[in-house]
Design a protein with these regions (language model features):
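Active-site phosphate-binding strand-loop segment of PLP-dependent enzymes
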Residues: 104-201, 211-213
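Conserved PLP-anchoring active-site segment centered on the Schiff-base-forming lysine
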Residues: 63-119, 123-125, 332
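N-terminal "arm"/small-domain region of PLP-dependent enzymes with the aminotransferase-like
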Residues: 1-28, 32, 248-250
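Short glycine- and hydrophobic/aromatic-rich loop-to-beta-strand nucleating segment
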Residues: 190-191, 199-200, 205-208, 256, ...
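Phosphate-binding glycine-rich loop
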Residues: 27-74, 88-90, 98-99, 147-153, ...
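PLP-dependent aminotransferase class I/II
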Residues: 35-39, 47-48, 123-127, 132-140, ...
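Hydrophobic/aromatic ligand-binding patch that stacks against planar heteroaromatic rings
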Residues: 87-89, 181, 261
């Protein structure tokens, strides 16, 4: 029986060849291929800079850290997401503020968002679930309305002057809203390049950010480099330059840089990505047609306002309980079709 895996990586001989060349080059950690991929993604998203890291989780956490968020602060996110959206808030010592979804929606309840913003609120992490951009215009409307409560703690917060939008766009690389790419809509954006994602580097992620008046992009990029490489003032590539061995440790930070082996996969994936997105759209169209007469609710991936990356095809079985859903998943598995549940709401977990 033919089986259909849930989300296998789409790897061709071209990716394998590029990885082999990286291995033969003698440079396998952060280096020229990582820098090349960063430039490709920045051009694609329409941003000045991109920092490639080893995961979206690292990206989410470093976004909060460059903003100086920590103990005594509050960060808002959705209750309907993967744990990383919230766990990074705990990592930095801030308080997690969860908002439930609106009725009949997978997005957070924006009416509740307005009510939970306090003087301690420093950021919101909205989630582009399944590759569909969330309602950014509504989010900006609300945080601008409540900006009088905002008390900045560092120069970036002060320059922005309101609650900062740090999008969890782990699913949404390649998505657009009102003609603008995800990655250049929120103040800061995190992408995932994990093995199950549309665009993969096996493991990996990236941070992007919009231009901020009064903030130097090169300085901000360097801050990410420090945070992702033990606070070391120069990466390994920079230290190979003539007479440039000496470096400084600027802080006791972290180790979450992307390697050139990972970037090698991404460089080829990037060339193939338009076709990969086109293929996903064709499959989603088939699903939409096949389920049109069924008693289910599905997300709309393509509208006049947005274009999804098509990462997940979520189906809500109407008027059915979890026992029916679980039996349905089993029946699909018996037919060789893998499915999954995205997501168990965070408050339903043991911790």
């Amino acid at each position: 029986m033919k089986t259909i895996s849930f989300s296998p990586p789409d790897i061709t001989e071209a990716e394998i060849k590029e990885v082999a060349e990286a291995l033969r080059s003698g440079w396998i950690t952060t280096g020229p291929r990582t820098k090349k991929l960063e430039k490709e993604i920045a051009n694609y998203c329409g941003t000045n800079k991109v920092v490639c890291l080893n995961s979206a989780t690292a990206s989410l956490e470093l976004n909060l850290r460059v903003l100086g968020i920590g103990p005594g602060d509050e960060v808002i996110t959705s209750a309907y997401t993967y744990t990383a959206s919230a766990s990074v808030i705990d990592h930095i010592g801030a308080k997690i503020v969860l908002i439930d979804t609106a009725a009949g929606s997978y997005e957070m309840d924006y009416e509740k968002l307005e009510s939970v913003i306090t003087e301690r609120t420093k950021a919101i992490i909205p989630v582009d679930l399944a590759g569909i951009p969330c309602n950014y215009s509504k989010i900006y409307e609300i945080i601008n309305y409540k900006k009088h409560l905002f008390k900045p703690k560092n120069k970036i917060q002060k320059a922005i002057g309101r609650v900062v939008v740090c999008a969890d766009a782990a699913h949404a690389f390649g998505a657009c809203q009102n003609g603008k790419k995800v990655g250049n809509i929120a103040d800061f954006t995190s992408f995932s390049f994990h093995a199950v994602k549309n665009f993969t580097t096996a493991e990996g992620g990236a941070s992007t950010w919009k231009d901020i008046a009064g903030i130097d992009n090169e300085e901000l990029y360097h801050e990410y480099q420090l945070l992702s490489l033990h606070g070391q003032s120069k990466d390994a590539l920079a230290k190979t330059q003539l007479g440039a061995w000496e470096y400084d440790i600027k802080g006791t930070y972290y180790k979450c840089n992307m390697t050139d082996i990972m970037a090698a996969i991404g460089i080829v994936q990037f060339k193939r990505y338009p076709e990969l997105l086109k293929r996903r759209k064709a499959i989603i169209t088939k699903y939409d047609e096949g389920l049109a007469e069924c008693n289910v609710d599905v997300l709309k991936h393509y509208t006049k306002e947005y274009v999804s990356s098509g990462h997940l095809y979520l189906v809500r079985l109407l008027e059915k309980d979890s026992a029916y859903r679980n039996a349905f998943i089993t029946k699909m598995a018996e037919r060789g079709i893998a499915t999954n549940v995205h997501y168990k709401p965070l408050p339903m977990h043991s911790n």
